[in-house]
Amino acid sequence: KFIGRVNLKECFKSATLIHSSDPDFQILEDGSVYTTHAILLSSEKSSFTILLSNTETQEEKEILVLLEHQTKVLKKRHSQEKVLRRAKRRWAPIPCSVPENSLGPFPLFLQQIQSDTAQNYTIYYSISGPGVDKEPRNLFYVERDTGNLFCTASIDRETYPLFELVAFATTPDGYTPEYPLTLVIRIEDENDNAPIFTETSYSFEVFENSKVGTTVGQVCATDQDEPDTLHTRLKYSIIEQFPALPTLFSMHPTTGVITTSSSKLDRELIDKYQLKIKVQDMDGQYFGLQTTAICIINIEDVNDNLPTFTRSSYVASVEENRIDVEILRVAVRDKDLINTANWRANYTILKGNEDGNFKIVTDSQTNEGVLCVVKPLNYEEKQQVTLEIGVVNEAPYTGTSRSTTNMATVTVNVQNQDEGPECDPRVQTVRIKENVPVGTKTIGYKAYDPETGSSSGIRYKKSSDPEGWVDVDKNSGVITILKRLDREARSGVYNISIIASDKDGRTCNGVLGIVLEDVNDNGPVIPQRTVVICKTVMSSAEIVAVDPDEPIHGPPFDFSLEGVSDSEVLRMWRLTKVNDTAARLSYLNDLRFGKYTVPVRVTDRLGQSLVTQLVVILCDCVTPNDCSFRPVSRTGNREVILGKWAILAILLGIALLFCILFTLVCGATTGADKKPKVFPDDLAQQNLIVSNTEAPGDDKVYSTNDFTTHAVGGSAHGIGGTLGSRVKNGGQETIEMVKGGHQTMESCQETGHDHTLERCKEGGQHTLDSCRGGPVATDNCKYTYSEWYTYTQPRLGEKVQQCDQDNTHMQAQDYVLTYNYEGRGSAAGSVGCCSERQEEDGLEFLDHLGPKFRTLAETCMKR
């Protein structure tokens, strides 16, 4: 039955083979889909695949066809509709098959195709497709009148497993009463192909001593007959093993996996086995076809054999004092594979090489052990050395032997050699007191002949004598003092180099260390010859003495002033002992600044003393590093010396004078224009005293207001000083009012903030501005010139007086000191923002106050 049509050309234009994955459906070349017989559509039959392939390019494509069950809806018959008629069934011959390699006779009848329309028409039958008009051509034909289908030759299934032909039924005049019919001819398989191994010869490796069941390898064979039939069901087996005994391998009949059947594989006995294997189809039955192949199994080596010495003992000889010389080669036997880690030997010296005179290495070419001398031997000390050497492989031992190291004994005979003198020990010492008289003789360096053990016949000479202090006797090695020996000059030890030689000219080198014993030949001295005493901050200085002699001739020291009892030194200075090596020098009277020479005698514990002329500088400074020495005249002529603080005081005085003159000039020009004060000049200093406030007042910061009095200008040019205020909180300048009836200007200090009073003109008035250009919170109280002069004059005078005092005290008094707590005081009143405002502008609101505030305003007005 015709189902539908698929457009195959859109998918694959060059398809040479078209067939369906489901035998219930047939596909024609034009894409028509037919059912081969009546089927019941179920969920399993909901889809099938059309397979398209090109046999030349081996290109394949698939088209998925989905089938939907459609129920026909019957309409109500109308009079004008035609009467429904039963459709006849399509012609559909049963599928047929042809045995592979059929012997005929040919042509061989297959089946008859016949159309039901032959009852009404004269039908001619024809076929087309592969095997008819396509390669392979002329394998099939059909009789035109009867529809009998014939095969003309035998067919190989492995080449053409099936043929899809299209049958046509037509009338003589060309009318086609039937749809084309797809006819599938299957080729029945015959067991005509023997299985073939993928390789003609296989090669595998397995380690010796492997356990039973160890996998060696797997073989594989293929069969071109029809899959999933008895013709392609294969069985594997081992036909023969060489060497035949013992049987060591087995093969799985289905998978072809070869495994070990014994653990007695020994590479040292047999390193390769050859197996003849067979594969047979028909599930291994005797009539099945079979093929054989060769499998070679190589036995891999493991370190199951220990290396063994060819001899158990060896004898070698070597001359004394020889180094880096080969004295013996030892060989080993090893059955493992040559030139592998299982065969290569590692030699070690197990015993007898405690002094490190020997080493043994492996010759990589011969695997022999090479014994060498790396440190000279001494015949006089040892004439024979017995060594015990061992050998192992590079790879770990995997055998069953308990001992893993093979050992041998080597006897090394040391041969005597005529040697030169021996300097032993190389460094020798002799102790001599320093300052011994020139010409003193003492023992010197000694070398000896190792053959005789004596120093007879050995000659000595110096090779190095840095100071030329000694001479060496060439026959005995005795040293003679040529110059005065000074222990302090050579740090207690003086080294000279000696060359000792015998009559044959053989030499040895040695060092003679002369240890100089100390004598008390040095008095203690004071290294620091100049002492600075800052008179303003200290009254003494500490001096320290040192003694280059050894401690036994050193401290404790005794310090004293050199001079008679009534000398000027004793009247001016005093020494006080601090510890064993230091004393404190202090002046007694109020000495002038200047430089003094004080002789100080220091005596060590044994009475050796030395006088040091100590230069003491009395300086006007804070630290000794700040001192710049100024000479002092000891006669009646005195010079006036100005310090830096005195110069600063002079400059400040000049600046103060300039400020006073500037203030007077400004006051004279602006006094006539001053407006009357709004508030009275009462005892409260123009502040409203509020007594009924129980809470703290508000902290307010206001914009810059005109300071109605005359301000002091900034620093005078050319003087180098500034008169200003320092910022304490947030960089703001404040003028605080004291409630006790005095108005003060307070200057505050905070690191890094300096401001100056600058003269500005604004509306004809002089104001106090911050040098930083920011707002300045000021008290707008009006000061008169007399009040300002009363306030500034005593303070400036006090600062000028303090400039010549000590720098430390001056710095402490030059700033407002901040205290954490000053005790509990009386309850403070609240001063609001309006009580501090002194502008004469913006007070018109007082004229419009209510009745409650008029009395208060009249009270505050200055009459």
Swiss-Prot record:
Phosphoserine modifications at: S826, S830, S835
Annotated Gene Ontology cellular component terms: desmosome; plasma membrane
Q: Name one GO biological process term.
A: cell-cell adhesion
Q: Which residues are glycosylated?
A: N120, N346, N495, N579
* Entry-linked Pfam families: CADH_Y-type_LIR, Cadherin, Cadherin_pro
Show which residues sit on the Extracellular side of the membrane: 90-644
Topology with regard to the membrane?
A: Single-pass type I membrane protein
Q: In which tissues is it expressed?
A: Expressed in esophagus and rumen. Weakly expressed in epithelia and cardiac muscle.
> What are the recorded GO MF terms, alphabetically?
calcium ion binding
What keywords appear on the UniProt entry?
A: Calcium, Cell adhesion, Cell junction, Cell membrane, Cleavage on pair of basic residues, Glycoprotein, Membrane, Metal-binding, Phosphoprotein, Repeat, Transmembrane, Transmembrane helix
* Positions annotated as propeptide: 1-89
The protein's location, in the record's own words, is:
Cell membrane; Cell junction, Desmosome
> Where would you say this protein principally sits, based on its record?
membrane
Q: Which domain of life is it from?
A: Eukaryota
Q: Where are the transmembrane segments?
A: 645-665
Q: InterPro entries annotated for this entry?
A: Cadherin-domain_protein, Cadherin-like_dom, Cadherin-like_sf, Cadherin_CS, Cadherin_pro_dom, Cadherin_Y-type_LIR, Catenin-bd_sf, Desmosomal_cadherin
Cytoplasmic topology: which positions? 666-863
Task: Indicate the segments forming the Cadherin domain, all copies.
Answer: 90-197, 198-309, 310-423, 424-528, 529-644
Assembly, in brief, is:
Interacts with DSP, PKP2 and JUP. Interacts with DSG3; the interaction may limit the interaction of DSC3 with p38MAPK family members and therefore repress p38MAPK signaling activation.
Q: What does this protein do?
A: A component of desmosome cell-cell junctions which are required for positive regulation of cellular adhesion. Promotes timely incorporation of DSG2 into desmosome intercellular junctions and promotes interaction of desmosome cell junctions with intermediate filament cytokeratin, via modulation of DSP phosphorylation. Plays an important role in desmosome-mediated maintenance of intestinal epithelial cell intercellular adhesion strength and barrier function.
Give the domain section of the comments.
Calcium may be bound by the cadherin-like repeats.
Protein name per Swiss-Prot or TrEMBL: Desmocollin-2
